Amino acid sequence: MVAQIRIGQGMDVHAFEEGKFVTLAGVQIPHTHGLKAHSDGDVVLHALCDALLGALALGDIGQHFPDTDPEFKGADSRVLLKHVYQLILDRGYHLNNADITVACERPKLAKYNLEMRQSIADVLNVDLNQISIKATTTEKLGFTGRQEGILATATVLISH
């Protein structure tokens, strides 16, 4: 039997607001600001959720967890990711790998890379080498360059 392979891509953006940390990939990272959001504002996990949902044409994170629903106010995005991944598993698919890029000037993320990757691997119950996270800047261009927020993109490969 030939394996069925699907690719999904997701993106998320959140603006900065008052706060003392940002949550990225389920990891609290000290910062001069937080992220404005209905849930915990974890752009990494939101982009990953959208990539997984997109791979099987299951809609997007806003359809599954609307920001108008008080149930998801302040929600831990690791719980959302676990729910989304269960939808993938229920359809007989599994994650081959995820490649994630985070764009921001600050906070600097290099020292949190392994912890963020491990956090995702733990939620999805996959090997660490299946999760890649890269951080970049936009060379001071655009809203991330002006330090107004953070952007994350995620690409996944899943197979049946």
Curated annotation (Swiss-Prot):
Disulfide-linked positions = none
Q: Which PROSITE patterns match?
A: ISPF
Q: Give the top-rank taxon of the lineage listed in the UniProt record for this protein.
A: Bacteria
Q: Which cofactor does it need?
A: a divalent metal cation
Catalyses which reaction? 4-CDP-2-C-methyl-D-erythritol 2-phosphate = 2-C-methyl-D-erythritol 2,4-cyclic diphosphate + CMP
Q: Could you say which EC number(s) this protein's record lists?
A: 4.6.1.12
**Site for Transition state stabilizer, residues:** H38, T137
Q: Name one GO biological process term.
A: isopentenyl diphosphate biosynthetic process, methylerythritol 4-phosphate pathway
State whether keyword Metal-binding applies. Answer: yes
Q: Which residues form the signal peptide?
A: none
How does the cofactor attach, per the note?
Binds 1 divalent metal cation per subunit.
Cite the GO molecular-function annotations of the record: 2-C-methyl-D-erythritol 2,4-cyclodiphosphate synthase activity; metal ion binding
InterPro entries to which the protein is assigned, alphabetical: MECDP_synthase (IPR003526), MECDP_synthase_CS (IPR020555), MECDP_synthase_sf (IPR036571)
Membrane-crossing residue ranges in chain numbering = none
Q: Which UniProt keywords apply?
A: Isoprene biosynthesis, Lyase, Metal-binding
> Where does this protein hold a divalent metal cation?
D12, H14, H46
Which of this chain's residues are annotated to bind 4-CDP-2-C-methyl-D-erythritol 2-phosphate? 12-14, 38-39, 60-62, 65-69, 136-139, 143, 146
Pathway as given in its UniProt record: Isoprenoid biosynthesis; isopentenyl diphosphate biosynthesis via DXP pathway; isopentenyl diphosphate from 1-deoxy-D-xylulose 5-phosphate: step 4/6
Spell out the Pfam families in the cross-references. YgbB
PANTHER family annotated for this entry? 2-C-METHYL-D-ERYTHRITOL 2,4-CYCLODIPHOSPHATE SYNTHASE, CHLOROPLASTIC (PTHR43181:SF1)
Q: What does this protein do?
A: Involved in the biosynthesis of isopentenyl diphosphate (IPP) and dimethylallyl diphosphate (DMAPP), two major building blocks of isoprenoid compounds. Catalyzes the conversion of 4-diphosphocytidyl-2-C-methyl-D-erythritol 2-phosphate (CDP-ME2P) to 2-C-methyl-D-erythritol 2,4-cyclodiphosphate (ME-CPP) with a corresponding release of cytidine 5-monophosphate (CMP).
What subunit structure does UniProt give? Answer: Homotrimer.
Tell me the protein family, please: Belongs to the IspF family.
Xref: NCBIfam families: ispF
The entry's protein name is 2-C-methyl-D-erythritol 2,4-cyclodiphosphate synthase
Which species is listed as the source? Acinetobacter baumannii (strain SDF)
